[in-house]
């Protein structure tokens, strides 16, 4: 805890709901990296506020217009958070569910044939999805084996696996188990140098919690 004074740590902890007490099991410390996440109290308040509003966005009334303004502001804030000025933002039930949809859409829309590439470093959110949709689209799934010593994969690992007819590539930006990250920019450049039209899907769920994101640069 050398990075935090006791006062700062308490201030941070105070921002989250149920940090040290479960509403069902009583006192405990939430220390789970794959079965949920702590929620900011401000998020709980905001979610409750908007859940109570009966109007849908896209209608011709004051409430609907206000909701549309909130959505546009949220998208602008998200662009700043992720370091980009282009692209689209959309939401879903979970990161795993969204990644499955992205892999499905990429595999379905890519040119026929070729292969799909992922690594043993990845979370099942992309790894299992890529294997499934490779089989569904009659493509070979090729695994990039991670380095046990480094605990991750490198651009060279991908370069040795990617082929000119690689259609879809999945990359894990940071491990949800160890927090170890990869050089996404170098890996993406390695992929593009061999298969310029390959669709790259990045699982950045854990990375965004630990590091500053710069989507435009990576």
Each predicted region: which residue ranges?
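Pyridoxal 5′-phosphate
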Residues: 1-213
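A short, hydrophobic C-terminal helix/tail in secreted or cell-surface proteins
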Residues: 214-218
């Amino acid at each position: 805890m050398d990075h935090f004074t006791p006062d700062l740590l308490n201030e941070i902890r105070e921002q989250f709901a149920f940090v040290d007490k479960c509403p069902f099991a009583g006192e405990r410390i939430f220390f789970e990296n794959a079965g949920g996440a702590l929620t900011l109290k401000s998020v709980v308040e905001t979610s409750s506020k908007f859940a109570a509003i009966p109007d849908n966005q896209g209608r011709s009334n004051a409430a609907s217009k206000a909701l549309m303004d909130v959505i546009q502001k949220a998208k602008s804030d998200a662009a700043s958070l992720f370091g980009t000025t282009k692209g689209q933002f959309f939401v879903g039930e979970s990161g795993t569910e969204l990644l499955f949809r992205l892999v499905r859409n990429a595999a379905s829309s890519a040119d026929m044939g070729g292969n799909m590439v992922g690594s043993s470093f990845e979370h099942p959110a992309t790894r299992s999805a890529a294997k499934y949709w490779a089989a569904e689209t009659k493509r070979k799934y090729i695994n990039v084996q991670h380095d046990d010593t480094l605990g991750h994969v490198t651009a060279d690992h991908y370069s040795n696996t990617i082929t000119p007819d690689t259609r879809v590539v999945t990359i894990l930006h940071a491990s949800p188990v160890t927090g170890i990250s990869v050089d996404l920019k170098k890996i993406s450049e390695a992929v593009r140098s061999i298969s310029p039209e390959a669709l790259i899907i990045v699982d950045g769920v854990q990375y965004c919690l630990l590091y500053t994101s710069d989507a435009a640069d990576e």
